[in-house]
Regions:
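Helix-loop-strand module that forms the ligand-binding subsite of alpha/beta enzymes
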Residues: 50-133
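Hydrophobic/aromatic beta-strand patches that form the interior of the parallel beta-sheet core
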Residues: 4-6, 32-34, 62, 103-105, ...
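A short acidic, helix-capping loop that chelates divalent metal ions and anchors anionic groups
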Residues: 40, 112-116, 152-155
Length: 200
């Protein structure tokens, strides 16, 4: 599987966890990294044809970004507006990304317990990420379970470095696609009638 990581940090060199993740991913086989801030420059202008060609040569697309104001930094939105165009990603003939996977790799400043009803952010991260999920669905992509590191505002260096292993494990999880996990569970139920009876 060919993986394309679109890094959308406004200043990757000054980043903490995103830079650590990029360093780890850069030494991983079959992974291509594109720094959108560097490519788009200060005007955030992209060569749509070149970016679309990069998407088409990969199977899994990863949006990597720090979670700012409950969304992504402006550079990713600019990239999406210019690259995921009518006739390419949606609309008549816009099925070029059909079957490809989209995964979000993000870090939040707030702790995990702040992202739920009753927490100070009120909603789960999954709820905040619905626009990205719908983007994937509109483009006929498979939206995979995101990897989220919470609590960057107070994270220690050792915690940041320790996040690399679970991050890489997440990206290589064969059951990231819920359809794959569901198929396995159904097969297990078919093979074990007693288990099927227990959950009915």
């Amino acid at each position: 599987m060919q993986i394309l990581v679109l890094a959308a940090h406004p200043n990757l060199e000054r980043s903490q966890i995103n830079r650590v993740w990029i360093n780890a991913l850069s030494s991983t086989a079959d992974v291509t990294i594109r720094n959108l801030t560097e490519i788009g420059g200060p005007t955030m202008q992209f060569d749509a044809a070149a970016e679309q060609a990069a998407l088409l040569s990969h199977d899994r697309i990863i949006f990597q970004f720090p979670f700012y104001w409950y969304s992504a930094p402006p550079v990713l939105k600019s990239w999406m507006d210019q690259v995921l165009t009518y006739g390419f990603a949606y609309g008549p003939g816009g099925d070029k990304l059909s079957g490809r996977e989209l995964l979000l790799l993000i870090s939040t400043g707030g702790p995990a317990d702040s992202y739920h009803a009753g927490g100070y952010n009120n909603f789960s991260v999954d709820e905040f990420l619905k626009p990205f999920q719908q983007t994937a669905l509109l483009a006929q992509m498979r939206y995979l379970r995101p990897f989220v590191f919470h609590g960057m505002a107070q994270a220690r260096t050792d915690e940041i470095e320790a996040s690399v292993v679970p991050m890489l494990q997440h990206l290589s999880d064969p059951e990231l696609d819920p359809a794959v996990r569901q198929a396995r569970l159904l097969k297990e139920l078919e093979a074990n009638p007693e288990l099927a009876a227990a959950v009915s």
